[in-house]
């Protein structure tokens, strides 16, 4: 499995059966009809990872409102995951409602390109956003030293779902873009005729936007 090509944006998420804190799960079929975020962390019982899991848990309902589930992963054992989840619930008073993949041999992590040069064994902080058709839509990598921005992951899902629904493209820092606020950008014109119809629109024919 580790010798196969790492999935890219726009490709089908690879089929795999994994052991998790919620039992065996077959991906991506387990989340058929839903989006899911698969995120890796370097290790259980580590401070930065604990802050991330706390934040994911606190915002879990926001993900669910977007028809999106969460699933974690590290190269720790399932027993380690279970002990860590129980520690978080007892000491931080928050339930971890999503499964965590146990990947002690690193096969899943290698298949998904989560083992980077700074460590030959531990996973970096990778994020795969997969849509309701099992297609990889976004990939992020954070170094071990920096915790993820969970709001940015939520923003990315909202943006991707809006792109699918409305056929628009999304500006920087949306929905608080410095030029156009919460508006979205029209895709480039496909013909000269379409371009001429946009000549008098701000900012120019190649840069038009609208309310959504």
From Swiss-Prot:
Its EC number is 1.11.1.24. GO terms for molecular function: thioredoxin peroxidase activity. Keywords: Antioxidant, Cytoplasm, Oxidoreductase, Peroxidase, Redox-active center. Belongs to the peroxiredoxin family. Prx6 subfamily. Residues 7-162 form the Thioredoxin domain. Thiol-specific peroxidase that catalyzes the reduction of hydrogen peroxide and organic hydroperoxides to water and alcohols, respectively. Plays a role in cell protection against oxidative stress by detoxifying peroxides. The active site is a conserved redox-active cysteine residue, the peroxidatic cysteine (C(P)), which makes the nucleophilic attack on the peroxide substrate. The peroxide oxidizes the C(P)-SH to cysteine sulfenic acid (C(P)-SOH), which then reacts with another cysteine residue, the resolving cysteine (C(R)), to form a disulfide bridge. The disulfide is subsequently reduced by an appropriate electron donor to complete the catalytic cycle. In this 1-Cys peroxiredoxin, no C(R) is present and C(P) instead forms a disulfide with a cysteine from another protein or with a small thiol molecule. GO terms for cellular component: cytosol. The active site is at 49 (cysteine sulfenic acid (-soh) intermediate). This is Peroxiredoxin 2. The keyword Transmembrane does not apply. Homodecamer. Pentamer of dimers that assemble into a ring structure. It is found in: Cytoplasm.
């Amino acid at each position: 499995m580790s010798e196969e090509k790492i999935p890219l944006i726009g490709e089908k998420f690879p089929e795999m059966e994994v052991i998790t804190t919620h039992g065996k799960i077959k991906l991506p079929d387990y989340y058929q009809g839903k989006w899911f975020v698969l995120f890796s962390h370097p290790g259980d019982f580590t401070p930065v990872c604990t802050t991330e899991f706390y934040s994911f848990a606190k915002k879990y309902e926001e993900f669910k409102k977007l028809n999106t589930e969460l699933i974690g992963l590290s190269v720790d054992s399932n027993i380690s995951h279970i002990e860590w989840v129980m520690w978080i619930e007892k000491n931080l008073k928050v339930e971890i409602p999503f499964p965590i993949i146990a990947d002690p041999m690193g096969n899943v992590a290698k298949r998904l390109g989560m083992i980077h040069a700074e460590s030959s064994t531990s996973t970096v902080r990778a994020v795969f956003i997969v849509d309701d058709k099992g297609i990889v839509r976004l990939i992020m990598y954070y170094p071990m030293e920096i915790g993820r921005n969970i709001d940015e992951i939520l923003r990315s899902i909202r943006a991707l779902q809006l792109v699918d629904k409305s056929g628009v493209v999304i500006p920087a820092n949306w929905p608080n873009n410095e030029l156009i606020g919460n508006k979205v950008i029209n895709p480039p014109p496909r013909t000269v005729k379409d371009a001429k119809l946009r000549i008098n629109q701000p900012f120019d024919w190649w840069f038009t936007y609208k309310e959504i």
